[in-house]
């Protein structure tokens, strides 16, 4: 039976910082300057995950496409190989915001790669600073969206409304994956889920983020009711990031040719 496998990973800009207190405090300087060797080690670990899982589509948030802090090392291009010839990478900040012009932030990106050429769009939400949403057509009636929402709850609420409008304008079934930054709890998603009718695939007891002793469920996969029974999600720890990766299997689904 055909299936589609999607990997969604927040690699934390390849700084090699786990959620441990020691990493986040003693190695915090990596946010300003990070040796290429460290980033290459992270990229190699990501490649091992990709090789093991063999996803059809990989989505990355918090990926660095090369800047002074990283000695112009392009993490996505180091991850890619001949199995994933189709890709895109873009700054997550809308060009109309001042953040897009700040050199330190200019290389902060979202990206994806795929085994097949899939129609896609870069959609920018109307609210917030981080606005980029990738809209990828997996098949004529199935669309994948992935993004990275604001850390501010009030801005997230506006972004959820913005994304809802995009979903409403897109026919067929939907899959939404991303870093939702809902550190205050999943109840803030209730209006969005009610209006879109999306269902969360995550096990609520399995956190995806850690800092020291704190744990939180912030990285989510959602899908339309019509495909929920065919969706299975696994959480994969990443020692090089404070976020776990999501592996979503959609059974009885075929990618567009």
State what each model feature region is.
Residues 1-82, 253-257:
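N-terminal, active-site-proximal structural segment of metallo-dependent hydrolase catalytic domains
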Residues 16-22, 71-73, 99-102, 157-159, ...:
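Short aromatic-enriched loop/helix-cap "lid" or pocket-rim segments at secondary-structure transitions
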Residues 6-10, 42-71, 144-147, 162-190, ...:
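Active-site beta-strand/loop signature of hydrolases that rely on acidic residues for catalysis
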Residues 33-39, 123-124, 150-155:
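Short, flexible loop segments at the rims of nucleotide/cofactor-binding pockets, characterized by
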Residues 14-15, 65-68, 95-97, 152-155, ...:
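Active-site environment of divalent metal-dependent phosphoester hydrolases
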Residues 118-124, 137-139, 165-175, 180-257:
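Metal-dependent phosphoester-hydrolase catalytic domains
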């Amino acid at each position: 039976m055909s299936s589609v496998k999607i990997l969604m990973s927040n690699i934390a800009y390849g700084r090699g910082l786990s959620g441990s207190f020691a990493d986040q405090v003693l190695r915090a300087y990596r946010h300003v300057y990070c040796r290429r060797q460290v980033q290459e080690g992270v990229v190699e670990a990501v490649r091992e995950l990709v090789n093991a899982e063999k996803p059809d589509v990989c989505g990355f948030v918090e990926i660095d496409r090369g800047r002074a802090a990283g000695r112009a090392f392009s993490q996505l291009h180091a991850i890619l190989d001949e199995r994933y010839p189709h890709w895109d990478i873009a700054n997550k900040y809308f060009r109309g915001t001042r953040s897009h012009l700040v050199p330190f932030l200019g290389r902060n990106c979202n990206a994806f790669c795929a085994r097949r050429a899939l129609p896609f769009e870069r959609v920018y939400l109307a609210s917030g600073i981080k606005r980029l949403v990738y809209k990828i057509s997996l098949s004529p009636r199935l669309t994948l969206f992935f993004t990275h929402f604001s850390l501010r709850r009030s801005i997230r609420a506006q972004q959820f409304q913005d994304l809802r409008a995009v979903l409403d304008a897109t026919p067929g079934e939907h899959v939404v994956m991303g870093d939702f930054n809902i550190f205050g709890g999943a109840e803030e998603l209730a209006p969005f889920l009610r209006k879109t009718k999306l269902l969360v695939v995550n096990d609520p007891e399995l956190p995806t983020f850690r800092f020291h002793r704190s744990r939180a469920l912030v990285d989510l996969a959602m899908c339309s009711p019509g495909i929920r029974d065919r969706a299975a999600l696994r959480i994969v720890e990443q020692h090089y990031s404070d976020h776990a990766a999501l592996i979503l299997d959609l059974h009885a689904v075929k990618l567009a040719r």
